[in-house]
Amino acid sequence: MSTYSLSETHKAMLEHSLVESDPQVAEIMKKEVQRQRESIILIASENVTSRAVFDALGSPMSNKYSEGLPGARYYGGNQHIDEIEVLCQNRALEAFHLDPKQWGVNVQCLSGSPANLQVYQAIMPVHGRLMGLDLPHGGHLSHGYQTPQRKISAVSTYFETMPYRVNIDTGLIDYDTLEKNAQLFRPKVLVAGTSAYCRLIDYERMRKIADSVGAYLVVDMAHISGLIASEVIPSPFLYADVVTTTTHKSLRGPRGAMIFFRRGVRSVDAKTGKETLYDLEDKINFSVFPGHQGGPHNHTITALAVALKQAASPEFKEYQQKVVANAKALEKKLKELGYKLVSDGTDSHMVLVDLRPIGVDGARVEFLLEQINITCNKNAVPGDKSALTPGGLRIGTPAMTSRGFGEADFEKVAVFVDEAVKLCKEIQASLPKEANKQKDFKAKIATSDIPRINELKQEIAAWSNTFPLPVEGWRYDAGL
C-alpha cells in the first residue's frame, strides 16, 4: 500500500509540463525558438544540435550527484552514471581515432574556459609562464589575454602570459617571431588554439617550438573539433600533450567541454635510454575535481555521449565537408563583392571580414544584420584598438549547414551581408557629423522607418523558415 504523503497540488507541480507549470518561461522559450527558426545563424561558435541530444539533456540523469570518477565516487547509487561516463569517454577516444593506451579524456568539464584553466593549474605553478595567440589576432580570452591597462582573463592574473601574433601583412601566425620570443620568455605552456583564425595551425612547428623550451603543447580545438573528428582538417593529436575542446560548436553536442591528455612515454634520454613517462592524468583529473568543480553535470555527459556517437558516423563526416565547402563558397563570393578577408580566406568553418577599408565597423554591421534576421558577431582584426567597435565581422557556417544550407545559399548570404554593409554606410552618412557614436547609429534605426530593413527582414525570415530547425519533436513534447 502506498504511503505517498505529498498533496495533490504538490504532486501536480512535479508532474505538470512546462507550459502548464510556468507559462511565462514557456512563452520566452517559444519566442526564442521562433527567432532561431526565422534567423540566418552565422555565429561561428554556435550550432544546431539534434533531437536526440536534447532528449538526453532534459532527462532524469540530471537528478544524480556523482563527485569523483567512475568506480571512485563519493556518493552511492552511481552504477549507471559510471556506465554512461565510461561510455562517453570511450566514444570520445573513438571519435578522434585515439588509442586508449596513449590518450585519456576527462568529460566532466562544465565549459571551455574553465577546462583551459584546469589544465594550466594542473601542469604549472601559480605565476608559471604561458604563451597564447593574442585575442585581436584570433586567439581566445582563456589563453591569457591582457591589455597594457588591465589583466582581462583570470588566466593572466594567476599566470604570467605573453601573446604571440599573426603577421599583419599576411594574417598568418608569425611562427618565426613566436620561436624567438619563446626562447626569451621560456613558457611552461604553449597554447595552440584560436577563436577567430581561419587558417590551419602548423602543429608540427608548434611542437618543435615547445620542445625547444621544454614547454607543454596544449591545443585548444574548441572551434574545429568537429572538423578534426571527421578528418576534414589535420589532427593535433600527433603533436599535442594536452587537447581541450568545447562540445557545442562544430562538434554539435551539448554545452560542455573535454580535456584529452597523453599517456605513456613522454621522452627518452638520448644518452641513457631512460624513459620519462607522462604524469598528466592524475594531475588533470584532480584539477577538475576537487580542484575546480564539485559534481559533474550528468545530463550533459549523457548528451555528449549521444553527440559523440553521431560524430563517428559517415553522415557527420559529410556534414563537416559541407561546412568547409560552404565557408569556401562564402569566401569566394565575398571576394567577388570586393571584401578583404583576414588571411585572404579560410581553411575551416568561418571567414573573418576586414571592414576597415570600407569605412564601417563590425559593431554597426552586426546591429543592422540583427534587424534583418541575420545573426553574426563583430570581431577584432589584427591592428584593432577597440573590442566594442572592432573592424571585423566573423561569419561561420556550422549552424546553417546543420539546417541544410548549401554553397549557393551561402553565396546568397554574402549578398545580404553586402547589402547590410551598404545600408550601414548610407545610414551613418545621413547623420550629422557630431552623431558619430554607436548609440546615434542605433537610435537612427530605432526611430526611423527604413523600408529596405523591413523588406529584408521579411524576406530573410521567409527564406529561413524553409530550412528545418531540428527541435520540432522536442517542442511538441514540451507543449510549445
Swiss-Prot record:
- BP-aspect Gene Ontology terms: glycine biosynthetic process from serine; tetrahydrofolate interconversion; tetrahydrofolate metabolic process
Q: Which residues form a coiled coil?
A: none
Query: Which reaction is catalysed here?
Result: (6R)-5,10-methylene-5,6,7,8-tetrahydrofolate + glycine + H2O = (6S)-5,6,7,8-tetrahydrofolate + L-serine
InterPro entries annotated for this entry?
A: PyrdxlP-dep_Trfase, PyrdxlP-dep_Trfase_major, PyrdxlP-dep_Trfase_small, Ser_HO-MeTrfase, Ser_HO-MeTrfase-like, Ser_HO-MeTrfase_PLP_BS, SHMT-like_dom
Alphabetized Gene3D superfamilies for the sequence: Aspartate Aminotransferase, domain 1, Type I PLP-dependent aspartate aminotransferase-like (Major domain)
Per the record's keyword annotation, is Translocase included, yes or no? no
The cofactors named for this UniProt entry are: pyridoxal 5'-phosphate
Q: In which pathway does it act?
A: One-carbon metabolism; tetrahydrofolate interconversion
EC number(s) stated in the UniProt entry for this protein: 2.1.2.1
SUPFAM superfamilies from the xrefs? Answer: PLP-dependent transferases
Example of a GO MF term: glycine hydroxymethyltransferase activity
Check the record and name the CDD domains matching this protein.
Answer: SHMT
Q: Which Pfam families match?
A: SHMT (PF00464)
Q: What is its main location?
A: cytoplasm
GO CC annotation terms, alphabetical: cytoplasm; mitochondrion
- Statement: the UniProt record of this protein carries the keyword Transferase: yes
Q: Which residues carry this modification: N6-(pyridoxal phosphate)lysine?
A: 249
Compartment(s): Cytoplasm
The family assignment reads:
Belongs to the SHMT family.
List other remarks.
In eukaryotes there are two forms of the enzymes: a cytosolic one and a mitochondrial one.
Function, as annotated, reads: Interconversion of serine and glycine.
Which NCBIfam families does the record associate with it? PRK00011.1
Which HAMAP family does the entry link to? SHMT
Record note on quaternary structure: Homotetramer.
Q: Which PANTHER family match?
A: SERINE HYDROXYMETHYLTRANSFERASE (PTHR11680), SERINE HYDROXYMETHYLTRANSFERASE, MITOCHONDRIAL (PTHR11680:SF28)
Protein name (Swiss-Prot/TrEMBL): Serine hydroxymethyltransferase, cytosolic
Name the gene. for
